[in-house]
A protein has these predicted regions:
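Periplasmic OmpA-like peptidoglycan-binding domain that tethers envelope proteins to the cell wall
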Residues: 43-50, 72-151
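Periplasmic peptidoglycan-binding/tethering modules of Gram-negative envelope proteins
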Residues: 1-66, 140-151
């Protein structure tokens, strides 16, 4: 597992305690196998994932994070095609988060990962299904102190 990454079901985000002094300023939410995946060669976000995305939106807003959305694919198809498909997946998730009310300035990036970072084997149908996914990299916003007026 990557450093500063947390593997969770995004539906359980409300139960994540990030307020401890050891909480990372940057975390990657690697959604587990129950979470946001795509059908083969598709980039549409299914309605069954809307609650998950609403939880991510609330988590980002309530904990002062900015988000980068990373799209992934399985290994079927050319590398070039898979990079384009992974971008379309990330863009579709971005559009849905914006539709649910996340401020556009909270989304700081879209990353097309293609087939380069599988989380499961591409040798099986089940593994390929897990690799057709998005991940979310969250970076805590710097809080800038407000200047005080000296009178």
């Amino acid at each position: 597992m990557r450093e500063n990454s947390i593997r969770i079901n995004a539906l359980e985000l409300k139960n994540v305690d990030i307020l401890s002094s050891e909480a990372p300023k940057e975390i990657t939410i690697v959604l587990d196998e129950r979470s946001l995946n795509f059908d083969f060669d598709k980039s549409n976000v299914k309605p069954e994932y809307y609650d998950l995305l609403k939880n991510i939106k609330e988590f980002v807003e309530q904990n002062n994070y900015e988000i980068t959305i990373q799209g992934h694919t399985d290994s079927i198809g050319s590398n070039a095609y898979n990079f384009k498909l992974s971008r379309r997946r990330a863009e579709a998730v971005k559009a849905k988060l914006l539709e649910f009310g996340l401020s556009e300035d909270r989304i700081v990036g879209i990353e097309a990962m293609g087939e380069e970072q599988p989380i499961a084997t591409n040798a099986t149908k089940e593994g390929r299904a897990q690799n057709r996914r998005v991940e979310f990299k969250l970076v805590q916003r710097e809080t800038i102190p407000m200047p005080t007026e000296n009178k």
